[in-house]
Structures are given as C-alpha cells and as structure tokens.
C-alpha cells in the first residue's frame, strides 16, 4: 500500500511542471551559476587540465547523478517544501534537516544576490558607459569604487532580488518554468557565439591548452577533493533546491531521464564556461585567475580591444545575469515554498517577506 503522501488524492493537491523540458531547463538553470564562468575554468586549468576534467565528469555522471536523482525523488514523494518532505518521509525529528536547508538557501541567496547585482550594474555600464572598458587600470579602479559604495551595492542588489522575486511570485508555471524556457536557450546561444569569436583570436590555443592539456604533475589529492566539491556545488544538491523543484513533478515523470539531462547540461556548461573566457584571456596574455577580477576587469578589457567590444560586453554580462538569476530563483523558491507550505503564506506575501 502506498503511503498517504503518494496517493492520487495527495498528488493532485500540488502544482506540476507543465512539461519535462520545463523542469529540465529550470533544474539546469538552478545548477548553472556564476561558478561555471568565474570559478571552474581556473580551477580546471590550475589543477592539471584534462586530468582534473576527467574525474569531475565521471563524478558528475555517477555520484552527482545519483545524489540529484535521490533528492528529486524525495521531493516528488514529499510533495511539499523541504521541511514538509523530511517530516512526511522521515518523521518529525527529520524536519530539522529541512530547516537547515531553508536557512542555507536563504544565507547563500543573501550574498549571491549581491554578486548578481554586480552583473546588472556592469550590464548597465556596458550599455550606456562603454568608454571605461578600454583601460584596464580604469576598470580596476571602477570595480574597486563600485564595491566600496554602499549605495551602488544596495541599489544593484535590490534590483537583482526584485527581478528574482517577480519570477518566483508568478509561480512555478508562469514564472520559473517560463523563465527557464526563455533564458536557458538564450544563454546557450550567447555563450556559443562568444566562444566561436574567442576561438578565432590569435594565440587562443593557449587557453585550450590550459584547459585540456594532460598535466598530472598539477593534480593531487586536494585537486580530487576540489573536483568532488565542485560536482556537488555545480549540481546544486544538498541544500534542498532540487528537492523543492522535485516536489512539483507528477508521479508519471521519468526522473532518470530528467535528472540525467540536468547533469549533462550542467557538466557541459562548466566546460563551455572555460571555453567562454580562457581562449580570449590567453590571446591577450592576461592573468587567468578566477573570481571577480576575471569577470569584471579582465574580460571587459578583452572586449574593449575590438570595435564591436560593446556588443560582446553586453552579451557577456547578459550571460552572467541569466546564469545568476536562474540559480537565485531556485534558492528563493526553496524559502518561499517553506513559508507557503509550513506557515500558510500566500505566494506573493512569501516572496515579499523573503526578499525584505
């Protein structure tokens, strides 16, 4: 006999994704974040290139897929927020793990939205003030002044979190699913366009060598741990975001196909993230170090060397924004689902409380 939370009467009480592709794109959007662009390329190149990529891909397709499948399966079984799911399946004592997941998602979103705000600010700069992009020293000074300005940071972060909240407030189908169907294909097209451009640059082969050469001397046990850690980080498993998304799946959905598709897209995006930045960075002999310097100083400087650099800069920061907001939406939905299911908030009120 099925437990009560798997019976048809219970399954019908919660909204479902309208299509498999909608869930896959939303799930991939949750997993594909800024780390694929500003963290993974440097991590892979500095830890042996292909020697690092091989265990990362293997772990993503094995351990990562198994964990994602388990989390999504639990979500579909529980048919509620992460707290609700743990309580229904494991009993009252297990609800504490759900609370920890909600707290983790909220804390991560609090600083992730700040970085997302930076992408909005730089997108606006690329659109309306492209002149500052041409000088690397000026770029560094501009970035330092920006992150040191409380007003600029608050305005940009607020803009980002408002966009995120609007998407979540519209609900699973009209908000999150629709956004994934629009933004993820656009993200892929723009990333591929920039990659094609970067591979045509002189000396771009240095970036390919940095990413894909077989360099065992740079790989050690710490590198293996980093590959494993990035596998979990890139697939967004462990905090409950995927469990929450899984709670909106119908009982007939083929989870193995959907989860395998998400893992494939996420792993591919990390590799594409390396191809997005490293060939261009090496073409100009610049420092490939990861983090904010790579995305907000080095890459804008590279784009500025071309007559159509403004177009490239706008496309690049749109890519960053799309990657950031699809991840942020999953974190906010984690919190909103908790407020709706456990505290009986309306969805829009839950979004308002979560963002404030």
Language-model features, listed with the residues they occupy:
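Hydrophobic core segments of alpha-helical transmembrane domains in multi-pass membrane transport
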Residues: 56-65, 102-127, 156-170, 185-198, ...
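Membrane-embedded translocation segments of transport machinery
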Residues: 12-17, 177, 181-325, 329, ...
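Transmembrane alpha-helical segments of multi-pass small-molecule transport proteins
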Residues: 22-28, 98-102, 130-170, 236-243, ...
């Amino acid at each position: 006999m099925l437990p009560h939370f798997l019976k048809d009467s219970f399954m019908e009480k919660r909204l479902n994704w309208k299509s498999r592709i909608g869930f896959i794109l939303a799930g991939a959007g949750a997993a594909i974040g800024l780390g694929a662009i500003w963290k993974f390329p440097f991590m892979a190149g500095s830890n042996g290139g292909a020697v690092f990529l091989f265990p990362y891909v293997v772990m993503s397709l094995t351990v990562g897929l198994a964990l994602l499948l388990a989390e999504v399966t639990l979500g579909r079984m529980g048919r509620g927020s992460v707290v609700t799911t743990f309580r229904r399946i494991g009993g009252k004592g297990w609800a504490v793990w759900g609370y920890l997941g909600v707290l983790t998602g909220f804390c991560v979103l609090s600083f992730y939205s700040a970085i997302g705000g930076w992408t909005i600010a730089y997108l606006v700069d690329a659109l309306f003030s492209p002149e500052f992009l041409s000088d690397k020293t000026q770029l560094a000074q501009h970035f330092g002044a920006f992150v040191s300005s409380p007003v600029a940071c608050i305005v940009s972060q607020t803009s980002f979190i408002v966009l995120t909240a609007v998407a979540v407030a519209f609900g699973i189908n009209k908000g999150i699913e629709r956004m994934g169907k629009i933004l993820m294909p656009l993200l892929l097209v723009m990333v591929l366009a920039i990659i094609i451009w970067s591979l045509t640059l002189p000396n771009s082969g240095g970036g390919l060598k940095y990413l894909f050469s077989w360099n065992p001397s740079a790989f050690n046990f710490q590198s293996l741990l980093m590959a494993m850690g990035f596998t979990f980080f890139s697939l967004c498993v462990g905090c409950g975001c995927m469990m929450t998304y899984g709670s909106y799946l119908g009982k007939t959905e083929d989870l193995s196909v959907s989860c395998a598709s998400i893992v494939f897209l996420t792993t591919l995006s990390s590799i594409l993230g390396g191809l997005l930045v490293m060939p261009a960075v090496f073409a100009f002999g610049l420092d490939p170090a990861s983090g904010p310097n790579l995305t907000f100083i080095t890459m804008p400087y590279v784009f500025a060397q071309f007559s159509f650099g403004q177009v490239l800069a706008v496309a690049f920061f749109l890519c960053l924004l799309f990657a950031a907001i699809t991840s942020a939406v999953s974190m906010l939905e984690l919190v909103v689902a908790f407020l709706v299911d456990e505290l009986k908030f309306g969805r829009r009120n839950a979004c308002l409380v979560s963002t404030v």
